[in-house]
Swiss-Prot record:
Free-text note regarding domains: The RING-type zinc finger domain is responsible for E3 ubiquitin ligase activity.
GO (cellular component) term, any one: endoplasmic reticulum
UniProt name for this protein: E3 ubiquitin-protein ligase TM129
Gene Ontology biological process: protein ubiquitination; response to unfolded protein
Membrane topology per record: Multi-pass membrane protein
Keywords for the protein's UniProt record, in alphabetical order: Endoplasmic reticulum, Membrane, Metal-binding, Transferase, Transmembrane, Transmembrane helix, Ubl conjugation pathway, Unfolded protein response, Zinc, Zinc-finger
Gene: tmem129
Cell compartment(s), UniProt: Endoplasmic reticulum membrane
PANTHER family linked to this entry: E3 UBIQUITIN-PROTEIN LIGASE TM129
Organism: Danio rerio (Zebrafish)
Amino acid sequence: MDRPDATFTLAYVVFALCFVFTPNEFRSAGFTVQHMFSEWLGSEDISFIQHHIRRTTLTVLFHSFLPLGYYIGMCFAAPEQNLMYVHHASQGWQMYFGLSLVIQLLSCALAFYWSRRGWANHPICKALSVHALPQSSWRAVASSINTEFRRIDKFASGSPSARVIVTDTWVMKVTTYSLHVALHQDCHLTVTDSKHHSLSPDLNTPVQIVTITVGSINPRVKSFDIRLKSTEYAELQEKLHAPIRNAANVVIHLTMSELFLETFKSYVRMNVVYKCPSGQELEPCIGCMQVNANVKLLCLCQSDEGECQQCYCRPMWCLTCMGKWFASRQDQQQPETWLSSRVPCPTCRAKFCILDVCPIE
């Protein structure tokens, strides 16, 4: 890794990946197309459609420049390769330069084609024209969307590279290279999948991501998927004019407590199993009286002395009720601390943490 060309290659690959997929650190530092060219792009709040037409065009141009940018950088990182003079470079580098140049020229030609006829050739404009009335154009649809986007009661969720926006009339998904649009009265939404993550990327809290497919009765409108947190599901329902179908029978956890309960159960199942002494019968859980007690509190964690305490109670609670008790004793304003906190036993008040909850065999 002492070679300058190897160091530059590694650094450029990391930079290119971050520039394309844009993590929060890059976005905060302003290394995004939207931030660097904000004056030319215009305000998203004022001209939403025009802003994203320009943004997607610039994004294609800059992302297609990355291969050529690597070649230019290597001209300085590896001067012994004679890359400054293409005809002196090796055949492999000549082919790479030619391919990079073709990619850049094609992207420029594509951007020029999109800009013709007042951007009418742009994919976003073509998608809007599908919803235009016979005597109208995509500009009328764009004007409607721009007006509704300026309202404060719109629903907006997700990262900038996959943002979901729902206004009074439109369901939209903003991606890196495109904008998907569907009309409320024409579309039908269906829950198709959900994924539960013990920790979200942004906060130290559990999160459930729900995938919803947006279809349309208009055959010219392509269906698309939107993803949002389960805690935002109820807000989305309020904004829509039609119910959301749950074709996959997905269980959606609408509150943080419900999400935490699933995470609590998954962690407890990884703990040490407690074997009941022979002859001991398990009684129904005193919390729900629906199932037998199936967890026992044992001080097994490696915490500092005086933190967790040994509980001498017999098994009296099921895993679900113990999880609900654990969640109910937390600071509701700081969910990121729930997994690492300690709560008193519901019966004897001995403090325990999540590592002390053992499933019963």
